[in-house]
Regions:
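Short metal-coordination and nucleic-acid-contact micro-motifs, chiefly zinc-binding Cys/His arrays
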Residues: 52
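Bacterial N-terminal signal peptides that target proteins for export
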Residues: 7-24
Length: 522
């Protein structure tokens, strides 16, 4: 203290000035480093985005980071994509479809990007994705209970609900439920009484009604697989079956029609597959048998309609494709079974397209498109604000623009019908991945058309009696109005949180399906 007290004021001031100078210098250096670091990070993210746009958009629509939350990108989506970039290997040893996958070349033999480039892509998505789950918007008011329908449970004795087909249109006066566990089509009367069953030896997922027979599609493997175990059978009214086409990759639909104008029956087959798949048509040959023709050589053919869209007298195809390259495609037939493709709608790879149908929603005389997108089952994933039911309005030249959207988490199928008989089309919708904790009634919704693109929300008291995978509409009791049939599949990917008590009830309550009897005529 004595030594310090003898210092001249000028010396003390000098020390202080030097300290301030050095502090300012260090702060300037730190600021410069911070600026340069921020610039480097910005450059790295820009580089990661450029790499993502180059490589991800080479296979499908570029997925913007905001489509998923950060955790889902890091723990699921990027890991799922790594084998397609050759930076990780998908283990195929011991898989029934392993050899087929290895031979297909669906995964590159070596890296498409370097390890460092892949990490740059990952850093870009991690930095730009939102931290919170996407789609957790404020809950909508609960749907009101409807008086339109009375629910009749349908029970397959001893069968845990694994319904893969619900049909009211296959056989007049009957409700059909196909069950993956029993491998049969179970037939119910309009009163809910079980009439009998036809054993098919597999899970039926689609039935097309013809004159005295049905073309029934058996998927082969309900869960994702590329084993060629699917088939189409001809089912007669006495329950006898004939094999039509076998060795298919998870077919989900088959439509008999004449595609080449030779007067013989051909088959359009939606080979949904998994990593592999194709949309094909099978030419009926003069002496019997079929010749296969590939139309689209990729997986994801989810739903097809046969229509003469261009008015030239032959059968064209409208096809909804899922599995990354999500599109609605018009395939125009030249009259001989050769097709030219026109993409009507295109979506990002996590859009989750599941089903569509073409109907005249606005009454202007041309066909609009009603679409449901809510497939949320590939991995645990947050609810998505862009999942729901949409109407795309046709301008008369098959140019489609979205006219209406109703958010529904996990929307799986939507049917536009005049359920209340007022002359316009309402929408019945099911969800396989709803928010069971906050909005369980969205398992089934009746969206009642109120005009001017406004729809009221209604549900049924038994909406959570099953996990609805499949649905159909038709007049099962012959009273002139449209009833609805729901099929419950209580298993499936654990992509959304399901309360344990609800999952147990699905397995044990004996509700394999629900017949919703329309009360309009009563």
């Amino acid at each position: 203290m004595m030594a310090f007290s003898r210092l001249k004021r000028s010396e003390v001031a000098g020390w202080l000035r030097e300290g301030v100078r050095r502090a300012a210098l260090w702060m300037a250096l730190a600021g410069l480093v911070s600026v340069r670091l921020a610039a480097w990070e910005a450059d790295e993210l820009e580089r990661g985005e450029a790499l993502a746009r180059q490589h991800c958009a080479a296979c499908h629509v570029f997925p913007e980071p905001g489509l998923l939350d950060r955790r889902t990108w890091e723990q699921h989506a990027l890991r799922k994509m790594a084998p397609y970039m050759g930076v990780a290997r998908l283990r195929t040893e011991g898989r029934p479809d392993g050899e087929r996958l290895e031979e297909s070349g669906v995964y590159p033999p070596g890296p498409v990007v370097t390890r460092e480039e892949w990490q740059a892509i990952g850093r870009y998505y991690s930095a730009r994705a939102p931290a919170r789950a996407v789609g957790l918007e404020a809950p909508r008011p609960p749907a009101a209970p409807t008086v339109q329908f009375v629910a009749r449970p349908l029970t397959i004795p001893g069968a845990v609900p694994r319904s893969t087909l619900a049909s009211l249109s296959a056989q007049g006066g009957e409700a059909w439920l196909a069950d993956a566990g029993t491998g049969a089509v179970h037939r119910f009367g309009a009163d809910g009484r079980l009439l009998g069953a036809w054993g098919l030896g597999g899970a039926a997922v689609h039935a097309w009604r013809g004159e005295g027979l049905w073309a029934v599609t058996l998927i082969g493997s309900v869960f994702p697989s590329d084993v060629l175990a699917g088939r189409v059978v001809r089912l007669r009214t006495d329950g006898a079956t004939d094999a039509w086409v076998e060795g298919l990759g998870r077919p989900v639909m088959s439509l008999p029609c004449d595609l080449n104008g030779d007067g013989r029956t051909d088959l359009v087959v939606n080979g949904f597959g998994n990593q592999l798949g194709r949309l094909s048509w099978h030419e009926g040959l003069p002496g019997g048998g079929w010749r296969a023709h590939e139309i689209l050589g990729r997986p994801g053919a989810a739903c097809t309609e046969t229509r003469d869209v261009d008015g030239d007298g032959d059968v064209d195809l409208l096809v909804l494709m899922a599995q990354a390259q999500e599109q609605l495609v018009l395939l125009e037939n030249d009259g001989h079974g050769d097709f030219s493709a026109r993409i009507l709608l295109q979506f990002h790879p996590v859009f989750g397209a599941v089903h569509f149908e073409s109907v005249d929603m606005d009454g202007d005389g041309d066909l609009d498109v009603v679409m449901s997108n809510g497939d949320n089952g590939e991995y645990p994933s947050p609810f998505k604000a862009y999942h729901g039911v949409r109407v795309f309005r046709n301008d008369g030249g098959m140019r489609l623009a979205e006219a209406w959207f109703h958010p529904v988490h996990g929307a799986f199928k939507a049917l536009a019908r005049d359920f209340d008989g007022d002359g316009d089309l309402d929408v019945a919708a099911i969800s396989f991945f709803p928010d069971y904790r906050r909005a369980p009634e969205e398992s089934f919704l009746l969206l009642r058309n109120e005009g001017a693109w406004r729809f009221g929300r209604e549900t049924i008291p038994g909406a959570t009696l099953g996990r609805w995978l499949t649905m159909d509409a038709g007049d099962v009791d012959g009273d002139g109005d449209l009833d609805v049939l729901l099929g419950s599949f209580c298993e499936g990917p654990p992509a959304v949180e399901i309360p344990p008590g609800l999952a147990t009830a699905w397995r044990t309550n004996g509700v394999n399906g629900l017949l919703l009897v329309n009360q309009r005529r009563r």
